[in-house]
C-alpha cells in the first residue's frame, strides 16, 4: 500500500523531533537489483525518480541524510548528486551505494560533494570485491581517501565467503567495515548470536 499523494508529498514537521538537526528523505525510490536478502524491489518496485533535493532540504540546517537504496542506478539520482555537489549541503547517504556504478564521472561528482562523515558502499558477495577496488581507485584519483569509505559487509552462513570478502576489504587500508548480519524476517531467518 502507498500513502495518498497529498500525504506522501507533505514536508516533515521537524519540530516534533527537536534533536534532529538534519533533513531526511529520498531522491529515488526502488531498486532494479533483486538481491535475495533485500525486500526493497518487492516493496517499492524498480528504481525511479522520487523527489528533487530542493523538495527535501531544510532552511535551518545544511545537513541532508538520503535514504535512497540505489541512488547511482538512475540518472536522476546522479543528477541530483551533481547539483548537490555545487551547494554547501553536507550529505550522508545512509544506504549503501553500488560499487559497480562508480564510473570516473560518478567518482568526480562524489568527490565534489560535502560529506557528513563517510561514503557508504556494500560488499555482499565476492563478485563485488573487484568493483570495490575499482571504485576506491577512481575515488582516490579524485581526491577521496580510503578513510572516507564505509563498507557494509553482509554476514551470511558461509563463513569462508564472509572472511574472503573481509580480508579483501582489509587490503584497502583505512576503510571502515561494518558487519551486517543476514536476516530475512519474512522467512524467519534471524542472525545467530
Q: Can you name each region flagged by the protein language model?
A:
Residues 1, 39-135, 146-156, 176-180:
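Core AdoMet radical
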Residues 21, 33, 129-132, 181-186:
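Extended, charge-rich low-complexity interaction segments
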Amino acid at each position: 500500500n502507498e500513502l495518498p499523494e497529498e500525504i506522501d508529498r507533505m514536508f516533515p514537521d521537524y519540530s516534533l523531533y527537536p534533536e534532529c538537526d538534519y533533513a531526511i528523505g529520498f531522491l529515488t525510490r526502488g531498486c532494479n537489483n533483486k538481491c535475495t536478502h533485500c525486500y526493497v524491489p518487492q516493496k517499492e518496485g524498480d528504481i525511479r525518480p522520487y523527489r528533487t533535493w530542493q523538495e527535501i532540504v531544510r532552511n535551518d540546517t545544511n545537513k541532508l541524510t538520503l535514504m535512497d537504496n540505489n541512488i547511482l542506478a538512475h540518472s536522476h539520482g546522479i543528477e541530483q548528486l551533481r547539483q548537490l555537489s555545487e551547494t554547501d549541503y553536507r550529505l550522508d547517504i545512509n544506504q549503501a551505494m553500488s560499487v559497480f556504478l562508480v564510473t570516473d564521472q560518478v567518482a568526480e561528482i562524489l568527490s565534489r560533494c560535502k560529506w557528513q562523515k563517510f561514503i557508504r558502499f556494500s560488499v555482499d558477495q565476492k563478485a563485488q570485491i573487484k568493483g570495490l577496488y575499482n571504485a576506491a581507485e577512481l575515488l582516490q584519483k579524485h581526491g577521496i581517501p580510503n578513510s572516507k569509505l564505509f563498507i557494509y559487509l553482509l554476514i551470511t552462513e558461509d563463513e569462508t565467503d564472509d572472511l574472503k570478502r573481509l580480508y579483501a576489504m582489509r587490503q584497502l587500508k583505512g576503510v571502515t567495515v561494518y558487519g551486517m548480519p543476514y536476516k530475512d524476517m519474512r522467512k524467519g531467518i534471524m542472525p545467530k548470536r
